[in-house]
Every structure is written in C-alpha cells, then in structure tokens.
C-alpha cells in the first residue's frame, strides 16, 4: 500500500509541476504608482490565470508615460513568446515602444519589461491600449497561452509642448530604470522594428516571495507620482472648457440631419432623375455610376422572375467566429493533425515573400496541395496560416476545397494539406493565362458562377461567412470544375489585391461591400457583394477591379453610387445579376439560392440558341 501511495504522490507532484509553467505579474513598484496599493498583482501565478485581473483595464494617468510587466518561466527552459500592441486612437497615442523584442523567449529568471506610452499632445483623450501576449508552453502539443492586457492611458493636450522634446531619451530611460534589479539584457525595440538599438547587462536577482498586501500606505510613500490616485476622478484634469462639448454636439447634430436628408433624397431621387425603367449608366473606364436597381422593376435588360427579394434583414442564424475561441481552434488542430513523414512534396506551384504552395502526395497515393511557409516566416504569420486554413473546416461540399490535414511537428514550418488532383490550379492564375482562359465561353462562365453560388449557399446554411470571396481564393481543374477555398497565404501570394487604410490591417478593399469598408461588418450580404466582383473577374479574365481608384477613395466612390462597369462581351443579363449583388443595403441584395435560380434561368435561356 505504501509504494502505491508513494507512486500516486509522485504523479501528483509531476502534474502540479507541469502546470506551474509561468508567472506574469505587476511588481510592487508598478502597482503602487498605478493603483496606489503596495502589493504584487498576478495575472498568471504558477500557470493559473487570474481572469478578474485580466478583465480590469488599468488606468494610466497623464503623468505616467510607461507601463511595465514582470514575468518568469517556471520550467527548466525559456518559453517562446510574441507580443502585439494596438491603440484605439493612433493620433493621440501614436507609437507605443517595447523595450524587448516583439518575438523572443520568457527567461527562467524574473525579468521586467516595459512599454513607452507617449501621447502626441494633440488633444485630451482616454486611449485604450491592448497588449496581446502569446506564450508557447509546449510546441509538441500546440499548448499556447494567449493573454490580453488592457490599459487606459489618459492623454492631455497640455503635453504637446514637451511631447516631441523628451520622447526619445526620457521614455527609454524610464523603461531602463524599471528593469534594473530584475536582470536580463536591456533592448529598446520599436513596435514595428525589431532592430536592437541598445544593450546592457544587469546581474539577475532571485525571485521575491509573493506579497499579497502591505501595511505601507500612500501617506508614507511621498512624491507627486504616488500622491496621484488614478481611481479618483477629481484628480484627472478636466477638458479646457464646456465649449468643446457644445461644438462637438452641434457638429454631430448637423451630420445626423444631413445624413437623413441624403437618405431621403437617394430614396426618392432615381424615379425623378431616371424616368425610364432601364438601367442608365455613366461610364468611367472600368467603373460606372449605377442607380438603385429595384427588385420589382421590369426593364428591357433582364430581371430574374420574382426571385430578387430582400432576405437578409430577418436572418437570425448564428454565425461561427471560431477564431475567437481558442478551445475550438485547438480541437480542430488536434483532429486534423497528420504525420509529416507521410507527406512528400513534388514541385513548387506558387511562391510569395514567405508563403509557399507545393504539389505533393499523402501516404504515397493521395494527390494534395500543400500550403506552408519559409523558415524566415514569423510566428504571427505561421499562426495566421493555421487559423485561416481552418476557416472551411468540415465544409463537405463538391465545390468547397477544405483542409484535409495539418502537420505541426515542426511548428515553424507547418504543412497544410488539401485534397487536389494534379490538374487543379488557382482560378486567378488560370484566368490570366492566355492559353487557357480565352477559350472559356459565356455558358461556361455562367456554370462556374453557379458552382460557386452553390458552395456559398452551403457555407451560409452552416453559419460560415467567408469574408474574402475572390478568384484568388478559388481553384479550377481541366474540366472547368471550380471550388471555393480559404484565404490562407493570399495576402502574401497576391499582395496587389490587399491594401491597408492606415490601420495596419491588409484587407481586399476592392472586393469589400460598403458596410465592410465602413464598419468592418461582414454578413451574408457582404459575401454576395464579393461574389458579384468575382463574377466580374471571370468575365474580364482576372483584371483588378477598380484599378484606377485609390484604396482610400473606395468608400467615397461606392457611397456616390459608382460600381464596376459592364465588361466587354458580357451579356446584359449576366451583368444585371452582378449589379443586384452591389446594392447599397445588404437586405436589398439577393441570397445565393436566388442567384442560383437567376444563373440557371439565364443558362437555360442562352443554351436554347446553341
């Protein structure tokens, strides 16, 4: 009995030690100057996450221009990490600076690192700073910890005079001072640049015992910083005058009234400006101005009989956003895991800056396409490949190419497998290849569009919003059978199709609906809009939509009613179906089941004469 008890005790000890992998906390100095309490605040204590602490957005008063964290790996080796920082207002708080690399290792000795938060001084504001820290606990099992810390930085306009004079040296000195006594190299790295510009050494200090509360109060601490209590509203400097509030309110009221007038004008205007029921076009090279196309209009061009009716306003299906659910992501990853030794690469199909697509075989018998990354790819790029490749997980449909398996034995260069024969190739590359695409007829284009509409109806029925429907995210074989696939690696392989509007996020601006551009709202209707652009791509042999328009001007042009022009040799009936997809309101666009009916009826109509 005694040996059994000893064995159980050893097992429990091993389990406990396996869980105690990480400490992340605010040290005494940091808690005292931010909150005014002499204590250590733990976010992760011996592997256990403190959700209450993570949910609290710590206020950072105007007289404090940096924040610090302390961490330590409790296992016998450093733990890989990556850090991302975002601010809610880049004009007021433009450039947080880390004093460690964005990607590195959590050391086995306690280390304090910090972030400089220097306001621009342009106006009074409270800016939310989001700090995302991902720590890889075990590469073999893909065991990651993702932590999100929030800080509310108070920025005052009065800081404008000194903002540019003291920014570079003072912030770095503050961060360097914060790290002394906790050991480790001192690096100052820009948020967008991992080039090390300074390096120093400090002897490591032993880890202190946990302090839960100290009798030392703020009255004994002294100094202006410690007397400032950020939790007391009266200590915050109020805005300069109530006049600012009055002016802002007046401007908002004028904007609201103008918007209502504009909506009323647009709703009534077309019938007065265009007495004919036909579609009147104002062409400007590859785009044109289109009036609102009524779903009940009977014009001389083409109307799909009684099938174009508003549908999206009453939809109540929940849509899956698995990328915000780490448990679901890990479950999918475990189910799709395959052995890398069973995958053989035969030839390189497509190559980007870091992305690679190969042809190969799985188990020496099944032909596959393999998406992977080069050795120099960052951890964030690897994570994005894995997340986006599982977007169509378990989407079983003849016209959907979903992921077959994933190998993460070498987490730096994972393999993502798709079942595909040797004749399968990217649809955009196919359209731009003169030897293939010019032989495609209108009838075949309509059939290809019908296949993709069926694929999208299947995804929507299962609560999946694609968000990036385009020719680059489709494949086609030598029988002109097309399949919709995910957008993994598309930003790297087709960089000209993605643009950033100054927010650091690269999106397919020329394919997005108005609501997706304005508010990043993605829904069934936004997918329909992108499908219309995809049909235009197929008719123009893979041309870039809105090629003459600057990405920053896209929202303005779409709000003014401009849409893609009718391609050369595109029948009026087919272009009318596209135009329905580009209605300004999502509820006015057809569903994919309605699009299938329209394409099917048009196919029947044109085959009568063949």
From Swiss-Prot:
Residues 1-20 form the signal peptide. SUPFAM superfamilies: Protein kinase-like (PK-like) (SSF56112). Its EC number is 2.7.10.1. Residues 202-230 are annotated as: Disordered. Keywords: ATP-binding, Cell membrane, Developmental protein, Glycoprotein, Kinase, Membrane, Nucleotide-binding, Phosphoprotein, Receptor, Signal, Transferase, Transmembrane, Transmembrane helix, Tyrosine-protein kinase, Wnt signaling pathway. Glycans are attached at residues 63, 99, 143. GO terms for biological process: axon guidance; axon midline choice point recognition; axonogenesis; canonical Wnt signaling pathway; cell surface receptor protein tyrosine kinase signaling pathway; chemorepulsion of axon; dendrite guidance; determination of muscle attachment site. The modification Phosphotyrosine is found at residue 498. In the embryonic abdominal hemisegment, expression is restricted to cell body, axon and growth cone of a cluster of 20 ventral nerve cord interneurons. During muscle growth and attachment events in the embryonic abdominal hemisegment, expression is in somatic muscle fibers 21-23 at 10-13 hours and 2 patches of approximately 15 neighboring epidermal cells (dorsal and ventral attachment sites) at 6-13 hours. It holds the Pfam family PK_Tyr_Ser-Thr. It is found in: Cell membrane. ATP binds at residues 349-357, 371. Residues 264-610 are cytoplasmic. The extracellular WIF domain is responsible for Wnt binding. PANTHER family: TYROSINE-PROTEIN KINASE RECEPTOR, TYROSINE-PROTEIN KINASE RYK. Belongs to the protein kinase superfamily. Tyr protein kinase family. Probable coreceptor of Wnt proteins. Involved in neuronal pathway recognition and ventral muscle attachment site selection. Non-vital for development. May be part of a signal transduction cascade involved in learning and possibly memory. This is Tyrosine-protein kinase Drl. It comes from Drosophila melanogaster. The lineage of its organism: Eukaryota, Metazoa, Ecdysozoa, Arthropoda, Hexapoda. The gene is drl.
């Amino acid at each position: 009995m005694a040996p059994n008890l000893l064995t159980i005790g050893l097992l429990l000890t091993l389990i406990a030690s396996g869980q105690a992998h990480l400490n992340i906390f605010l040290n005494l100095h940091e808690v005292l100057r931010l909150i005014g309490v002499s204590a250590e605040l733990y976010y992760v204590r011996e592997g256990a996450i403190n959700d209450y602490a993570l949910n609290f957005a710590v206020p950072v008063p105007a007289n404090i221009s940096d924040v610090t964290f302390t961490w330590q790996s409790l296992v016998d080796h450093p733990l890989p990490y990556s850090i991302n920082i975002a601010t809610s207002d880049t004009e007021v708080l433009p450039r947080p600076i880390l004093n460690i690399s964005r990607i590195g290792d959590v050391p086995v000795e306690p280390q304090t690192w910090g972030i400089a938060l220097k306001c621009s001084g342009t106006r009074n504001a409270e800016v939310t700073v989001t700090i995302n820290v991902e720590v890889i606990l075990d590469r073999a099992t893909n065991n990651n910890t993702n932590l999100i810390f929030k800080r509310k930085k108070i920025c005052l306009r009065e800081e404008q005079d000194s903002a540019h004079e003291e920014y570079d040296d003072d912030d770095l000195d503050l961060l360097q001072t914060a790290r002394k006594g906790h050991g480790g190299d001192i690096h100052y790295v820009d948020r967008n640049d991992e080039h090390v510009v300074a390096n120093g050494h400090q002897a490591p200090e032993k880890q202190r015992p946990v302090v839960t509360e100290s009798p030392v109060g703020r009255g004994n601490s002294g100094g202006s910083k410690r007397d400032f209590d950020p939790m007391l509203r009266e200590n915050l400097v109020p805005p300069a005058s109530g006049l600012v509030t009055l002016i802002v309110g007046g401007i908002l009221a004028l904007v609201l009234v103008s918007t209502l007038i504009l909506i009323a004008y647009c709703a009534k205007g077309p019938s007065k400006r265009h007495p004919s029921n036909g579609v009147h076009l104002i062409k400007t090279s590859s785009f044109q101005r289109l009036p609102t196309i009524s779903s009940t209009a009977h014009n001389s061009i083409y109307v799909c009989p009684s099938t174009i009716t508003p549908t999206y306003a009453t939809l109540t299906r929940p849509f899956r956003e698995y990328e915000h659910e780490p448990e679901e992501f890990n479950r999918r990853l475990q189910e799709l895991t395959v052995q890398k030794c069973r995958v053989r690469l035969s030839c390189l199909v497509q190559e980007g800056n870091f992305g690679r697509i190969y042809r190969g075989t799985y188990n020496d018998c099944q032909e596959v396409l393999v998406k992977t990354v080069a050795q120099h790819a960052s951890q964030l790029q690897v994570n994005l490949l894995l997340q986006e490749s599982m977007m169509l997980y378990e989407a079983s449909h003849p016209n959907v190419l979903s992921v077959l398996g994933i190998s993460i034995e070498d987490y730096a260069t994972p393999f993502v497998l798709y079942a595909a024969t040797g004749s399968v190739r990217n649809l955009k590359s196919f359209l731009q290849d003169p030897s293939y695409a010019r032989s495609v007829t209108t009838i075949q284009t309509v059939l290809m569009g019908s296949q993709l509409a069926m694929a999208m109806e299947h995804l929507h029925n299962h609560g999946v919003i694609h968000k990036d429907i385009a020719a680059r995210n489709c494949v086609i074989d030598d029988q002109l059978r097309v399949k919709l696939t995910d957008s993994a690696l598309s930003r790297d392989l087709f960089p000209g199709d993605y643009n950033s509007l100054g927010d650091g996020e690269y999106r397919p601006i020329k394919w997005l609906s108005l609501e997706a551009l304005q508010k990043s709202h993605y829904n069934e209707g936004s997918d329909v809009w992108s499908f219309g652009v995809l049909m235009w791509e197929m008719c123009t042999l893979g041309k870039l939509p809105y090629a003459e328009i600057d990405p920053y001007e896209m929202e303005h042009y779409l709000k003014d009613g401009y849409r893609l022009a009718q391609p050369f040799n595109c029948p009026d009936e087919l272009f009318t179906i596209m135009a329905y997809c580009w209605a300004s309101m999502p509820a006015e666009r057809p569903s994919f089941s309605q699009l299938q009916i329209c394409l099917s009826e048009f196919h029947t109509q044109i085959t009568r004469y063949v």
